Amino acid sequence: MAKLSLRKKGDGGGKSAAGKALGAVLWTGAAIGAAALANAVIFYKTPPLTSKLDGGEIRYFPTPDGDVFYKKAGDGPPLLLVHGIGAGASSAEWENVWHALSEKYTVYALDLLGFGKSDKPSLFYTAENYLSLIDDFCRQVLRVGDGRGEADVIATSLSAAYVIALSQRDPSIFRRLVLICPTGIEELASDPTLSSRAVHRIFKAPVVGTSLYNLIASKGGIRNYLKSRLIADPSKVTDEMVETYHVSAHQPGGENVLPSFLSGYLNIDIADEFKQIVDLPLLVWGRQAVETPVGNAEAFLLANPNAKLEVIEEAGMLPHVEQPEAFLAAVRPFLAAADPAPAAQEAEAAVAAAG
């Protein structure tokens, strides 16, 4: 005798399709909510960032997009320090040369918008944002350009490319350029592609993008990146260094620039501009640089035979961090060669005071 089934046709003996879908939605919502909460906790638990540059004056430069933090120290010709771009980057990278440079120069070290102690607005960041920022900072804070004198500048990586571009937009802004592992000819010179634009959209997506950022900018992620890509000697990647990058990376809004950096919107091609530099630019490269290897210096030297190359041994992308004495030994004579004689300095000071 056949058994009577109480199951309705199409029942399947389990959850309905609608029930399964609802369950999936609930689980997805819970996962997203948990990720959002985790992201919020990471930023909430991060302490305020303290400048690693001892001494000097703390100041802020107001811009239409937010306030830019900078420190000023020393007395003498103006010297601008512009840090590189990446998760956790800030003016802290100048810590090992800050005091030495301020002995002879009025040194300005800024945190670019979106980094360090500067404001971090939610913008669609492009190279032009930083070109405009550095240009305005030089004119309004250093008071150079437009016939008012020039500033020396030391800049790292992508920021060095911005400085090269600005030096040709207005040759009256900068006097001597020190370019540390610059990009813009063979590295970080191309426009965004379709795939890189997709990366930008993913990193800007709510929750998902922030989660990816927090993974990259975790202490483990930062430590690994410093050891494998930036610093030649892994033993110099200290807990303090990792903490500095981590705290800087997780200030409110710290995730806003990385999508543009990873997707190429901050790239700039400066091959033509570098060819046009008349005054001797100094290229400083770490022998063990990985991100922008020392072999890339050849393209710069071919583009402009006036350029001078100094290679720092036992250093990677940040020779001023790893080998500050060797870095200063290369940079000081280069800058001093352009300094006016003491009598001329006194005359300039008298004219400035009279004006």
Question: Each predicted region: which residue ranges?
Answer:
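Alpha/beta-hydrolase fold catalytic core
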Residues: A2-L79, E103-Y105, L142-G147, A336-G355
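Conserved catalytic-core motifs of eukaryotic protein kinase domains, centered on the activation segment
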Residues: S91-E93, S118-L123, A189-D191, V294-G295
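Conserved alpha/beta-hydrolase catalytic His-Asp/Glu region
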Residues: L188-A189, T193, N214-Q276
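Conserved loop-alpha-helix segment in the C-terminal half of the alpha/beta-hydrolase fold
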Residues: I277-A315
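Catalytic active-site module of serine/aspartate enzymes centered on a nucleophile-bearing elbow/loop
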Residues: P305-G355
